[in-house]
Amino acid sequence: MQHESPIIRRKSTRIYVGDVPIGDGAPIAVQSMTNTRTTDVEATVAQIRALEKVGADIVRVSVPTMEAAEAFKLIKQQVSVPLVADIHFDYRIALKVAEYGVDCLRINPGNIGNEERIRSVVDCARDKNIPIRIGVNGGSLEKDLQMKYGEPTPEALVESAMRHVDHLDRLNFDQFKVSVKASDVFLAVDSYRLLAKKIDQPLHLGITEAGGARAGAVKSAVGLGMLLSEGIGDTLRISLAADPVEEIKVGFDILKSLRIRSRGINFIACPSCSRQEFDVIGTVNALEQRLEDIITPMDVSIIGCVVNGPGEAEVSHLGLAGSNKKSAFYEDGKRQKERFDNNDLVNQLEAKIRAKASMMDSENRIEIKVQD
């Protein structure tokens, strides 16, 4: 039940993606990206709504063609979450989606074109009050930087980013955030650390092309965890070769683990052993599925025996400590007279958790310090 994070966040400027504040101490925004064909409007809208349901603050949509831009117009009309248009190669697509109400433009300086094309995009963004994300990726650096450095390095990624930052500065445009993603954890982490020392703009974090659901989640947790623990990062995306909904869940789990931002239940559960008095794994899995709709930040400990059960329960909003036939139940750290039948734990716990959630402030947010 700890509500204060020891992390002091890097001070950054404030921009808005739609109505979502980014930077300057705002809650770290969690976003994902659709993996449907953008021209399949029905499927894309359905996926965006699924992402919004699990807490996505922002959703990015790839817009590779003018046909996709026309589809984007229809998609935007049917969803409420802010949308970022992912633009590569053809700057005219950025101009088109700007007409259709896009909330943010993501462009890659390695392939968007010459300075005049960038100027056209920036002028349009300024006129329509649309922020830009400069998205540098280790796999698509400019050719001259590939020649200069021989391979992606932190210096190469940051030089690419700073070229575009300087260009936007010359155009008197400051409504932007920056990312320097790489698939290698150390390359990404060192790139973000270097960039954080050079600019005050918000930083969008990500380990790009991280891998499948399990390996990608681990890689992202390691890389982003290092950066977030140092106070670096204002938005994030977990890149998984999996259902995008899982990206949002993992993103919130990372923030929750660092006590930066909580959404939903933080289950504290033992891996179980021969001392367990009930099926811990089955109980936790069932509750996670049943209670996905709960957004209230809450710690729930489910421990199968009395070795660690009481101790964990005493620092949780709700807790269960396994005992023979009936297990001990705790609320706000205090043991209750009521005991739970080990053969019906899921139903009993679900009822208690839902009742507790209805009593708590669902808008509660963990306090985070920001550097002066």
Curated annotation (Swiss-Prot):
Which SUPFAM superfamilies does the record cross-reference, listed alphabetically?
Dihydropteroate synthetase-like, Nitrite and sulphite reductase 4Fe-4S domain-like
Gene Ontology MF terms: 4 iron, 4 sulfur cluster binding; 4-hydroxy-3-methylbut-2-en-1-yl diphosphate synthase activity (ferredoxin); 4-hydroxy-3-methylbut-2-enyl-diphosphate synthase activity (flavodoxin); iron ion binding
The Enzyme Commission number assigned here is 1.17.7.3
Q: Name one GO biological process term.
A: isopentenyl diphosphate biosynthetic process, methylerythritol 4-phosphate pathway
Pathway assignment reads: Isoprenoid biosynthesis; isopentenyl diphosphate biosynthesis via DXP pathway; isopentenyl diphosphate from 1-deoxy-D-xylulose 5-phosphate: step 5/6
**Cofactor, free-text remark:** Binds 1 [4Fe-4S] cluster.
Cofactor(s) needed: [4Fe-4S] cluster
EC class name: oxidoreductase
Where is [4Fe-4S] cluster annotated to bind? Answer: C270, C273, C305, E312
Question: Pfam families annotated for this entry?
Answer: GcpE
InterPro entries this protein is in?
A: Dihydropteroate_synth-like_sf (IPR011005), IspG_bac (IPR016425), IspG_bac-typ (IPR004588), NO2/SO3_Rdtase_4Fe4S_sf (IPR045854)
Which reactions fall under this protein's catalytic activity? (2E)-4-hydroxy-3-methylbut-2-enyl diphosphate + oxidized [flavodoxin] + H2O + 2 H(+) = 2-C-methyl-D-erythritol 2,4-cyclic diphosphate + reduced [flavodoxin]
Keywords from the named record: 4Fe-4S, Iron, Iron-sulfur, Isoprene biosynthesis, Metal-binding, Oxidoreductase
Signal peptide bounds: none
Family the UniProt entry places it in: Belongs to the IspG family.
What is this protein's function? Converts 2C-methyl-D-erythritol 2,4-cyclodiphosphate (ME-2,4cPP) into 1-hydroxy-2-methyl-2-(E)-butenyl 4-diphosphate.
> Per its record, how is this protein called by name?
4-hydroxy-3-methylbut-2-en-1-yl diphosphate synthase (flavodoxin)
Show the taxonomic lineage. Bacteria, Pseudomonadati, Pseudomonadota, Gammaproteobacteria, Vibrionales
Gene name for this UniProt entry: ispG
